[in-house]
């Protein structure tokens, strides 16, 4: 993937800040839980922004948060356009970020591997190698 245009990267970061502040201060939807905007990806022409988000809670609460984000999308778009003084405010698409779930599965796999290593180490204590104590030939020995 090419490195993004520095202006587009800066604009994406500004959009993330504006949306996060607006969600915290202006959106009063009770379905909106504790939401974190983790990343914003902006197209090269700055017309479409994909906002990745995470939220804490049960599946039902997260579904409510998703619905609240969708219903606030228009207000958030106009706020982004006004605060950043953009001629064209980008369309906002909210996508739930799967990073926390992925990190959890990786942590679980690492914990299983560590437990397996500990079990192997426990079993190998006091074990003797198969064959002779020193299986290598030495030059001082007769053949």
From Swiss-Prot:
It is found in: Cytoplasm. GO terms for molecular function: ribosomal small subunit binding. Gene3D superfamilies: 3.30.300.20. Residues 117-143 are annotated as: Disordered. The keyword Cytoplasm applies. GO terms for cellular component: cytosol. Keywords: Cytoplasm, Ribosome biogenesis. The keyword tRNA processing does not apply. One of its GO terms (biological process) is maturation of SSU-rRNA. Residues 134-143 have a biased composition (Basic and acidic residues). It holds the Pfam family RBFA. Monomer. Binds 30S ribosomal subunits, but not 50S ribosomal subunits or 70S ribosomes. Belongs to the RbfA family. PANTHER family: RIBOSOME-BINDING FACTOR A, CHLOROPLASTIC-RELATED (PTHR33515:SF1). One of several proteins that assist in the late maturation steps of the functional core of the 30S ribosomal subunit. Associates with free 30S ribosomal subunits (but not with 30S subunits that are part of 70S ribosomes or polysomes). Required for efficient processing of 16S rRNA. May interact with the 5'-terminal helix region of 16S rRNA. This is Ribosome-binding factor A. It comes from Cutibacterium acnes (strain DSM 16379 / KPA171202) (Propionibacterium acnes).
């Amino acid at each position: 993937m090419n490195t993004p245009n520095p202006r587009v990267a800066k604009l994406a970061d500004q959009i993330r800040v504006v949306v996060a502040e607006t969600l915290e201060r202006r959106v009063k939807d009770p379905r909106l839980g504790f939401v974190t905007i983790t990343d914003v990806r902006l197209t090269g022409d700055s017309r479409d922004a994909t906002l990745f988000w995470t939220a804490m809670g049960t599946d039902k609460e997260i579904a409510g948060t998703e619905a609240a984000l969708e219903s606030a999308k228009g207000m958030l778009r106009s706020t982004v356009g006004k605060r950043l003084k953009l001629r064209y405010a980008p369309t906002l698409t909210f996508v739930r970020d799967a990073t926390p779930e992925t990190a959890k599965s990786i942590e679980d796999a690492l914990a299983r591997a560590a437990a397996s290593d500990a079990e192997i180490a426990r079993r190998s204590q006091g074990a003797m190698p198969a064959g002779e104590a020193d299986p290598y030939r030495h030059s001082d020995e007769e053949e």
